[in-house]
A protein has these predicted regions:
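Beta-propeller domains with acidic blade repeats across secreted/periplasmic ectodomains
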Residues: 1-213
């Protein structure tokens, strides 16, 4: 085994899934919000404004969770196979775990909620996000999370609710009826559930409905 790149982060909110890009020439890497980006990025699609420009004062988490974590939070990078070139393509996740490509080579992920925030105005459910170039999904520590209606923050394709995301995979190539071959399958550890997410084009992105599979 050869170490290609040491990443500062680990554990439940560390680096997670690694998959091939559609052209099979590079890798996509997703990491949780306790994982620092490499000190030197070769490219960054996200504007620098997508950092700590909060309009309202922020209240840190009362139990101390992620108090020192700042933008970009969780992230997705495109990486060369030798680990030398890193390009940030999307950020603002809490703890997205799996990555999956649909039949059109579009990238999706399943992001985690902060369960301690449940019932507060700033609670954000687990959700499926369409990982587009330069996208920002607005995770910030404490009460500073960007609502989905902020112009700079993309909305999810679908909110799932409380849970704990693990894997994600499309049914492409499976011996299923067409509807299920096109579905995104997301795994929730908390409730031991696999959901089939049926995505419908909506403008430049998608909206989804869920079905317990």
């Amino acid at each position: 085994v050869e170490t290609l790149k040491k990443i500062n982060g680990g554990g439940e909110h560390g680096p997670h899934d690694v998959i091939l890009t559609p052209d099979k020439k590079n890798l996509y890497v997703v990491a949780g919000n306790h994982t620092q980006l490499p000190a030197k990025l070769d490219a960054k699609r996200n504007p620098s404004a997508f950092e700590e420009d909060l309009l309202l004062p922020r209240q840190p988490d009362a139990r101390g969770h992620a108090r020192t974590i700042r933008a970009p939070g969780g992230w997705v990078c495109k990486v060369s196979p030798d680990g030398k070139k890193w390009e940030l393509i999307s950020s603002g996740y809490r703890n997205a775990y799996g990555l999956a490509l649909n039949g059109h080579d579009e990238l999706f992920t399943f992001d985690a909620d902060m369960e301690w925030d449940y019932g507060t105005p700033w609670y954000r459910p687990t959700r499926v996000n369409h990982v587009v170039s330069g996208s920002e999904y607005g995770w910030r520590t404490g009460t500073g999370k960007w609502p989905s209606h902020y112009p700079d923050s993309l909305p999810p394709a679908i909110d799932i609710g409380p849970g704990c995301p693990t894997g994600a995979e499309f049914g492409t190539g499976a011996n299923f009826p067409r509807r299920y071959r096109d579905a995104l399958y997301i795994l929730d550890w908390t409730f031991g559930t696999i959901y089939a997410i049926h995505l419908t084009p909506d403008g430049a992105s998608y909206t989804g409905t869920r079905e317990t599979f």
